[in-house]
Amino acid sequence: MSIKTLTLYNFNTSYSFGKEEKKEKEQSLTSKLARLKDSYEKEGLRKAVEGIIIIHDHGHPHILLLQDNNYFKLPGGKLKPGENEIDGLIRKLTKKLSPTGTPVSDAPWEIGDHVSTWWRPNFEPSLFPYIPSHITKPKECKKLFVVTLPEKCKFAVSNNLSLIAVSLYEIYNNSQRYGAVISSIPALISRYTFVYLNVD
């Protein structure tokens, strides 16, 4: 398998950031699992997509995460019934990270490889990179895609969230703080070679 090269731009000089009044669902674990149960009862398996957005700071890869107090998550969300995964991820990233009114057709996201699939066997917090042998009807399937950015773009997130860049060495093997999915990212993207560019 050939090694792919990704071009990363500087977090501090390439991008601008703002906050807006955006309608965000309650982020508590209890409310999230309640929504999952309601969705499962109506539609069956919940299908979700999330983006591993990679940038650099001082020549080291960082991942963009949304933070709500001490809760961290990758940007993304639930697919609509029958929605294509790439289209759905672009829609969710645009809704959560772009200024209000940005057409999906103008979205800056460059969706790359699907690098991981995670399964939620029950209405509980735990996710696994496989379906446990005793589970016949998992409740959620979450797919992670690598996302890169052009040299310039503008972010705008909900007032109650922060968009932060976290280094790979902070994330790696740190499931206690970031959870199993996010802490696995350094291994998932180790197959890539990165080129670091700085734009004034």
Curated annotation (Swiss-Prot):
Domain Nudix hydrolase: 45-170
GO molecular function, one term: mRNA binding
CDD domains referenced in this protein's UniProt entry, alphabetically: NUDIX_Cfim25_Nudt21
Keywords linked to the UniProt accession: Cytoplasm, Differentiation, mRNA processing, Nucleus, RNA-binding
Its biological purpose: Component of the cleavage factor Im (CFIm) complex that functions as an activator of the pre-mRNA 3'-end cleavage and polyadenylation processing required for the maturation of pre-mRNA into functional mRNAs. CFIm contributes to the recruitment of multiprotein complexes on specific sequences on the pre-mRNA 3'-end, so called cleavage and polyadenylation signals (pA signals). Most pre-mRNAs contain multiple pA signals, resulting in alternative cleavage and polyadenylation (APA) producing mRNAs with variable 3'-end formation.
Family: Belongs to the Nudix hydrolase family. CPSF5 subfamily.
Protein name: Cleavage and polyadenylation specificity factor subunit 5
